[in-house]
Each structure stands twice: as C-alpha cells, then as structure tokens.
C-alpha cells in the first residue's frame, strides 16, 4: 500500500500506530515534527508556519529534510495545506493516515474530520487515528474489520442525509435506512461478524470506530 502520514499522536499509543503501517511517505505538520523527533523518524516533508513546534527542533530538521514554510497569517490550517499538497501530486496514495489531528482544540478536531471529505471525494481511504478512535469518511461502500482495538462502530452523516443505508454483520443491521444530520440513530453499533459491510446510495458518511 502507498500510505502517507500527517503529524503524530501522543503518549505510548502513537508508537503502536506508527508501527502498524508501512509508510511510503511521511509528512510532518508543524508540532508533529516533535513527535518525529521522539520516535526517531525523518519525515520526507515538513509543512507549517511553525508557531507551535519548538524552534530548536525545527532548526535541527532544516538540515536534514525538505521544508514548505507557510505564512502565519494564512487562510488554511497546516493540515489543510498538507492535504492539498497530497492531492495535487501526480501519483496519489491509496491510503492516508492522519495522527495527532485531534486534541483539546475542538475547532481543530472538527475541522480535521471535515478535511477527510477531500479524500472521500477522490476515493482515497483516509483515517484519522488517536488513542481512542479511528475515523474515516466515505462516499461509497465501506468495510469495517473486526478488531480487539475498537468495540463500537458509529455512523454519522456529514451531508444533510445519507440515504439507502444497508448494514450487514452488525448487531444492529439495516436495509434502506436514511441517516439524517442532527439525529443519533447511527451511534454505538457493534460488529458481530468478522467484517461489517456498509453500503448506501447517496451522501457522505463518517465512520467512527471507538475503543471505549
């Protein structure tokens, strides 16, 4: 698989995530550079205005890898710019993993979940992973594999509604269901089969696998 990673996540769990994938290209956004240092990782590209990362760490990496410096007074976040960079490449990845894109800033967390829409529209599998969740957005059929890491599977419409939802392999299966924005009917389902199939006719769907 051609996999790209943006930023990093914290504490012990980040190392587990970083070891789960064979990354072909690594992009660090601003403070994510500090995670690269902690894990002894050399990113292929560093993007940011560097208003968060420690100055000495940024300086040490400038001698080792490529940088794309951004203006502090820009319209888009560093992560948004990184995603645009990925999608502008002649050869796009099959899968993208974003780590460290959630946290105490709920505005950034919601914005980063929304940015998954760009990958969904290109048909690229993209996952936002933190210590408790694995989040993706899809515009088509999606398969969830059973794993001990995540107990719950929740489906949230990103568009006004997601129509014709069919679920197979779940505790709560469905056929022809409509998920509407502002309702919670898709929250806290569970897999009972090795794989769960999610199909729908129209809309954009957020799929959240949760640890607890």
Residue ranges, per PLM feature:
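Single conserved hydrophobic/aromatic residue that forms the stacking wall/gate
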Residues: 2-13
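Acidic/Gly/His-enriched mid-domain segments of enzyme catalytic cores or analogous surface patches
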Residues: 19-21, 31-121
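Generic secondary-structure signature for well-ordered alpha-helical cores
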Residues: 88-91, 118-124, 160, 177, ...
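Class I SAM-dependent methyltransferase SAM-binding "motif I" and its flanking Rossmann-like core
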Residues: 107, 117-147
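Long, charged alpha-helical interface segments
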Residues: 138-212
């Amino acid at each position: 698989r051609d996999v790209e990673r943006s930023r990093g996540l914290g504490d012990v769990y980040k190392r587990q995530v970083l070891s789960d994938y064979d990354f072909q290209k690594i992009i660090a956004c601003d403070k994510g550079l500090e995670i690269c240092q902690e894990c002894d990782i050399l990113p292929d590209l560093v993007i940011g205005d560097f208003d968060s990362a420690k100055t000495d760490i940024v300086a040490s990496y400038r001698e080792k890898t490529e940088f794309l410096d951004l203006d502090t007074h820009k319209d888009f976040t560093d992560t948004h710019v990184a995603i645009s960079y990925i999608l502008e490449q002649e050869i796009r990845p099959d899968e993208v993993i974003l780590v460290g894109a959630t946290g105490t800033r709920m505005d950034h967390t919601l914005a980063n979940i929304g940015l998954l829409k760009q990958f969904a529209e290109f048909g690229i599998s993209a996952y936002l992973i933190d210590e408790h969740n694995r989040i993706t957005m899809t515009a088509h059929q999606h398969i969830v594999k059973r794993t001990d890491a995540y107990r719950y599977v929740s489906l949230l419409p990103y568009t006004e509604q997601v129509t014709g939802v069919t679920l197979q392999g779940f505790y709560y299966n469905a056929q022809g269901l409509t998920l509407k924005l502002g309702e919670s009917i898709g929250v806290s389902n569970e897999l009972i089969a090795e794989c769960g199939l999610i199909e729908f006719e129209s809309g954009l769907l957020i799929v959240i696998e949760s640890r607890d």
